[in-house]
C-alpha cells in the first residue's frame, strides 16, 4: 500500500495517528476502524503482536484527536469533511433522542412496607380473642382492679360501723375563722 502524503518520510518514525489521517485523506471516504488498523499494519509493516499491544493506545488517541470524528458503528472519518453546522446538528439530534428516552414514563414501583407485611398478625392486637389471665394483664389493669376492690371493701366497712348517739337531724353551722377569732378576743 502506498500513501502519497507520507512519501519521503521514514516509516519507522511515523505514528499510527499520522498514518490513519493520511489514509483517510487519500481514500476520501469513511472507513471501519478494523480497516484502518489493517491498513496501518500493512503500511508500517508491524506484526500482529505489535498491533495488539498498541491498539488500545491508538483507539484512545483517535478519540481524543480533534481531526477524527466517529460516525457510529465503529466508522471513522475526518472532521474536516463535515461543516460545523452538520456536526452540531448530529450532536443535537443525538441529544434529542436521549431526551425522548428520558421522557418516557418510568414504571411505577410498588410501595414496600419496610417494617414487614401489613397482613401479619400481631398477638398484642388480639386481646379479645382469648381469656385474659392475671399473667396476661398489664400493671395498669391490675392496679385498676385492685383500686375497685379496695373501694368496695372500704364502703362495706363504713356500712358496718354503728354510729353512737347520732341525732337524725344534725345542724351544721359553718362559721368563718375570722368570726371565731373575734369571739375569742372579746372574752
UniProtKB/Swiss-Prot annotation:
Location of the HTH HARE-type domain = 14-81
The record, for Pfam families, names: HARE-HTH (PF05066)
Residue span of region Disordered: 97-187
Q: Which PROSITE patterns match?
A: HTH_HARE
* Bias-annotated ranges (Acidic residues): 117-149, 157-187
GO molecular function, a single term? DNA-directed RNA polymerase activity
Which GO cellular component does the record give, naming just one?
DNA-directed RNA polymerase complex
Q: Which GO terms describe its biological process?
A: DNA-templated transcription; regulation of DNA-templated transcription
InterPro entries for this protein:
Asxl_HARE-HTH, RNAP_delta_N_dom_sf, RpoE
Which keywords, in A-to-Z order, does the entry hold? Answer: DNA-directed RNA polymerase, Nucleotidyltransferase, Transcription, Transferase
Q: How does it assemble?
A: RNAP is composed of a core of 2 alpha, a beta and a beta' subunits. The core is associated with a delta subunit and one of several sigma factors.
Annotated family: Belongs to the RpoE family.
Instruction: Tell me the function of this protein.
Output: Participates in both the initiation and recycling phases of transcription. In the presence of the delta subunit, RNAP displays an increased specificity of transcription, a decreased affinity for nucleic acids, and an increased efficiency of RNA synthesis because of enhanced recycling.
Full protein name: Probable DNA-directed RNA polymerase subunit delta
Amino acid at each position: 500500500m502506498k500513501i502519497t502524503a507520507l512519501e519521503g518520510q521514514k516509516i519507522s518514525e511515523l505514528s499510527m495517528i499520522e498514518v490513519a489521517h493520511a489514509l483517510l485523506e487519500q481514500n476520501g471516504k469513511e472507513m471501519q476502524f478494523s480497516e484502518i488498523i489493517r491498513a496501518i499494519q500493512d503500511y508500517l509493516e508491524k506484526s500482529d503482536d505489535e498491533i495488539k499491544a498498541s491498539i488500545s493506545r491508538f483507539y484512545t488517541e483517535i478519540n481524543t484527536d480533534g481531526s477524527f470524528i466517529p460516525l457510529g458503528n465503529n466508522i471513522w472519518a475526518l472532521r474536516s469533511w463535515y461543516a460545523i453546522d452538520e456536526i452540531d446538528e448530529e450532536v443535537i439530534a443525538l441529544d434529542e433522542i436521549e431526551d425522548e428516552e428520558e421522557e418516557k414514563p418510568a414504571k411505577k414501583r410498588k410501595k414496600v412496607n419496610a417494617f414487614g407485611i401489613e397482613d401479619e398478625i400481631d398477638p398484642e392486637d388480639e386481646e379479645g380473642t382469648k381469656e385474659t389471665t392475671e399473667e396476661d394483664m398489664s400493671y395498669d389493669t391490675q392496679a385498676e382492679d385492685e383500686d375497685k376492690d379496695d373501694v368496695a371493701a372500704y364502703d362495706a366497712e363504713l356500712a358496718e360501723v354503728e354510729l353512737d348517739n347520732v341525732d337524725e337531724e344534725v345542724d351544721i353551722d359553718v362559721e368563718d375563722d375570722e368570726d371565731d377569732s373575734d369571739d375569742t378576743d372579746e372574752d
